[in-house]
Amino acid sequence: EERIIKDFELSKFIYCSDAGLASKKNKKFNNIQNRAYIITQSLKKLKKDDQEIALKHTGFLEVGSQSTKRINIDDTDFTDEINKNRLFYKEIPLESPVEERLIVTYSPKYAAYQKNIRNKQILRASNMIQTNGKLKKNQKNPNDPARFIEKITTDKDGEVIEEYYSLDQEKIKDESMYDGFYAVTTNLEDEDIKAIIKISERRWQIEECFRIMKTDFKARPVYLQNRDRIEAHFLTCFISLIIYRLLANKLNNK
């Protein structure tokens, strides 16, 4: 950011980042001299009281609607096609050294997407259990299917039994609580909610592209040494991503 200010002589901009760069130092730096920020907030890392309010299904407004009536998202039938693209939000005051607001959104389309991804991972976890091999959890990968597997060594009475593996239903239930929910913190006071969400949404779309490139198209690691071949590899991945996005758009992201 300091280089942007120096090299491009820009002093007024909105800093947008994921939760990994949500330090107090970054927020303070972007709270002066016409700078502002929109930063992803991990719902899992909120204080317990704030988390309960954020994940509560009541108190929502609809983005783009003039209605001030608060909505309980459980009262909406999201199997109805007309409701799938609706987006809801609520604001929660936070105790913070910087004057900011927490904006929590709920998207039924995003909830369905997350549930679909998790169901595939649960299926992979079930297959891992059935192989009867030794299971190694990749602690560095939060999307490792093995996170849904628990080792059972005692029965319900606490008696030691021959160990076996089973799906961790508590873990599955815990993760499903966050389906569809997303949150950002911002020091923008007068900016429209819809505009703030739009800015943050573009960052999420870029991140998803990188994820698809890496996981689906195996962009990395690169097992090549010749520069021309390396460039050809990334060009192939990039063209594949464009085709993927065009097909997804054609199929309405189904």
Question: What are these language model-derived features?
Answer:
Residues E1-K254:
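Anion-binding and metal-coordination hotspots
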